[in-house]
Amino acid sequence: DVAPSRGLGDVYKRQSLEQFLSDVWWGEPDVLLLDLAPGTGDMAISVAQALPNAELVVVTTPQPSASDIAVRSGLVALQVPMKVRGVVENMSYYEHKGEKLEIFGAGGGQRVSEQLSAALGYDVPLMAQLPLEPEVREIGEAGRPAVLDVDGALRTDGIGQTFRGLAERLLAV
């Protein structure tokens, strides 16, 4: 029977989350971002229980299939007392010779924003559209945050400014 082992896995995931949140010294963070896989929302529910003031940022890509899943993930806010702060669209475009190429289509983030706003009864804004940048992957694989230069300063190029704008929106009350 598959159900008992799935349930046990959920228990271990929740315990791991609780240990992660309690054993790591966070200082006084302004924002703590947890990257949760889309799906049933079990982890989002666990986060809401462990962090009562948690808010949700839904991340999608432009494709309709991805935005449909993102809407379902955002609707977990109806099950728990969690506000959806906004939507981020990842891999929105690839810039080549000054032209923005929409490799994966367009509009997924806006669709998610509109559908969640309608379903939840409040504005769920599209907070950022992040470009597809091979350099971000390379920097991540090297173990460095993609928003920082080699010297540790915040990047001042397009991706740095995009992330700065997103951070400012997340910190705004």
Mark where each language-model region is.
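Conserved beta-strand segments of the P-loop GTPase G domain that flank and frequently precede/overlap
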Residues: L33-L34, V57-T61, V87-E89
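Switch II (G3) loop of P-loop NTPases
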Residues: S5-R6, E18-A44
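Glycine-rich phosphate-binding loops of nucleotide-dependent enzymes
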Residues: L36, Q49, T162-G165
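Inter-motif core of Ras-like GTPase G domains
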Residues: S22-E28, A44-P64
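Short glycine-/polar-rich loops that comprise or flank the Walker A/P-loop
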Residues: L8, L51-L56, V80-R85
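Single conserved hydrophobic/aromatic residue that forms the stacking wall/gate
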Residues: D1-L8, Y12
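Active-site glycine- and acidic-residue-rich loops that bind
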Residues: P62-I69, I103
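C-terminal lobe/tail of nucleotide-utilizing enzymes
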Residues: G74-V173
